[in-house]
Amino acid sequence: MEKDHLHNPDSLGDYGLETVKMIKDRFAKGVDRGILLMRHSAREYRRDIHDLQNPLTERGRDLALRMGDMLGADLKMRGFASTAQRCIDTADLIMRRTERDVRGERSKTRVTRVIEAFGVFYALDQVRMWKSLQAADGLDSFVAKWLKGEVAPDVMMPARVAVSQILSVMKGRLLTISSEKGRSHSLDLCVSHDMTLYLVRQAIGLETTFEQPVNYLDGLLMFETDGELRVSSHYGKEVCVDDFINT
């Protein structure tokens, strides 16, 4: 394995810090397993390649490594991601920092698995979707119109159908988490895109697209408590999502 790129955590800004705090606070309250639907780390914005091919920047890689350091080695972690390489790399880099066995030694490398539900599966016509995005007043406006049913149904899957699919897959991940000796908590990373986070967050009744941004490494945490499936954001809101899942 190549040596991790050295980084100065004090120079990386706040990306991911509130997400880590949300996870640790929830585990401290008695939850022992969770699913984190999160945005990838800092990326490039090249115009000469397809947008989904834009990779992480060096700073983005450092941010992911720092997040892994902060989550700590006592977590049992699995990685899932969209097909975009920047999402896969984000999960890989975070897990790299938590790959320690019960003796504190580096364990076998875990591999991030691609799951299409964390990609842009809801875009039925990507060319027209990109054109609609460019015509809209920002991504937040586009997602708001999508949720209102104002985007053509042959361009985007109905928003609430997409949300149900995403939450169903997350629930499936939660049900398959098992305990591991030496680790008290389990977390699945599900790395996706800001559009997915904006969509799910507003649809389930958390922050709207206009209230709060979705920054790099922001996430929504799914967990079970008191017989309910719940999702929280690091901004402090929390909702039950059982009614949003068609299972």
PLM regions: where:
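Active-site-proximal alpha-helix that buttresses catalytic centers in soluble enzyme cores
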Residues: M1-T112, E211-S233
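Active-site-adjacent alpha-helix immediately C-terminal to a catalytic or transition-state-stabilizing loop
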Residues: S164-V231
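Active-site or metal-binding loop neighborhoods of secreted/extracellular toxin and effector enzymes
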Residues: V155, E207, E224, E228-T247
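Short low-complexity stretches enriched in small and charged residues
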Residues: G34-M38, A136-W146, L175-C190
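Phosphate-handling substructures
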Residues: E44-Y45, H50-P55, I94-M170
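Generic surface-pattern signal
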Residues: D25-K29, R96, K148, S168-L175, ...
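A broadly tuned preference for mixed-charge, low-complexity surface segments
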Residues: S82-R97, A136-E150, H234-T247
